[in-house]
């Protein structure tokens, strides 16, 4: 498993804006989408291309096109939806697979309440979207769900991550790559990332 911390100046700047306590819903939502797009650019650099000949304005011309497995983006409800547009803007043909989990208050384990995956998952590369990789429990459940559906190439895109969550995924699924704008210091006693972004879902949907 590789962990890619994207240290591009634009990502650093935009993430810094997102950390502001009094940021508006619109600004947080827009920035989440923009950073997701930048992460997508990095996460797709290893995609293979093939040469094709097309009719150009001055006659036949050779161009390169992406080949191989098709992409499905997998936003984790609900906050992952806030990153979806940034990815679709770059990969408009991507199919969308959606998963939803809630946390059992007694066991603190993720419980699946919704799943709808694209067809032919064994032929796709999955890009999981979630603003926060905290304890890693929800991501772990999502990866296992995708693998059970036949998907073998999985990547995760996150705005911020905690070392604890990354370590959990590295141990359980070393074949899954992680792309993140920043790795923060730690989790607090209730599982929030510090310094983090706060509740990303509330900030994206304006329910804070």
UniProtKB/Swiss-Prot annotation:
It catalyses: UMP + diphosphate = 5-phospho-alpha-D-ribose 1-diphosphate + uracil. Uracil binds at residues 193, 198-200. 5-phospho-alpha-D-ribose 1-diphosphate binds at residues 78, 103, 130-138, 199. The keyword DNA repair does not apply. Pathway: Pyrimidine metabolism; UMP biosynthesis via salvage pathway; UMP from uracil: step 1/1. Its cofactor is Mg(2+). GO terms for molecular function: GTP binding; magnesium ion binding; uracil phosphoribosyltransferase activity. The keyword Amino-acid biosynthesis does not apply. Keywords: Allosteric enzyme, Glycosyltransferase, GTP-binding, Magnesium, Nucleotide-binding, Transferase. Binds 1 Mg(2+) ion per subunit. The magnesium is bound as Mg-PRPP. One of its GO terms (biological process) is UMP salvage. InterPro entries: PRibTrfase_dom (IPR000836), PRTase-like (IPR029057), Upp_B (IPR034332), UPRTase/APRTase (IPR050054), Ura_phspho_trans (IPR005765). Allosterically activated by GTP. Its EC number is 2.4.2.9. Belongs to the UPRTase family. NCBIfam families: PRK00129.1, upp. Catalyzes the conversion of uracil and 5-phospho-alpha-D-ribose 1-diphosphate (PRPP) to UMP and diphosphate. This is Uracil phosphoribosyltransferase. The lineage of its organism: Bacteria, Pseudomonadati, Thermodesulfobacteriota, Desulfobacteria, Desulfobacterales. The gene is upp.
């Amino acid at each position: 498993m590789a962990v890619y911390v994207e240290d591009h100046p634009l990502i650093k700047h935009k993430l810094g804006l997102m950390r502001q306590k009094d940021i508006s819903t619109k600004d947080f939502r827009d920035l989440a989408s923009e950073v997701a797009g930048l992460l997508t650019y990095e996460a797709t650099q290893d995609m293979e291309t093939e040469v094709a000949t097309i009719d150009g304005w001055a006659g036949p011309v050779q161009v390169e096109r992406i080949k191989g497995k098709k992409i499905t983006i997998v936003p984790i409800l609900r906050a992952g939806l806030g990153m979806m547009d940034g990815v679709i803007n770059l990969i408009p043909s991507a199919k969308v697979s959606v998963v939803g989990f809630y946390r059992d208050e007694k066991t603190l384990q993720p419980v699946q309440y919704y799943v709808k995956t694209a067809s032919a998952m064994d032929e796709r590369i999955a890009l999981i979207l979630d603003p926060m990789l905290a304890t890693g429990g929800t991501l772990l459940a999502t990866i296992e769900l995708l693998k059970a559906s036949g998907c073998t190439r999985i990547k995760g895109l996150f705005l911020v991550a905690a070392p604890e969550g990354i370590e959990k995924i590295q141990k359980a699924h070393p074949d899954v790559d992680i792309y993140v704008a920043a790795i923060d210091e730690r989790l607090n006693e209730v599982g929030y990332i510090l310094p983090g972004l706060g509740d990303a879902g509330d900030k994206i949907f304006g329910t804070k």
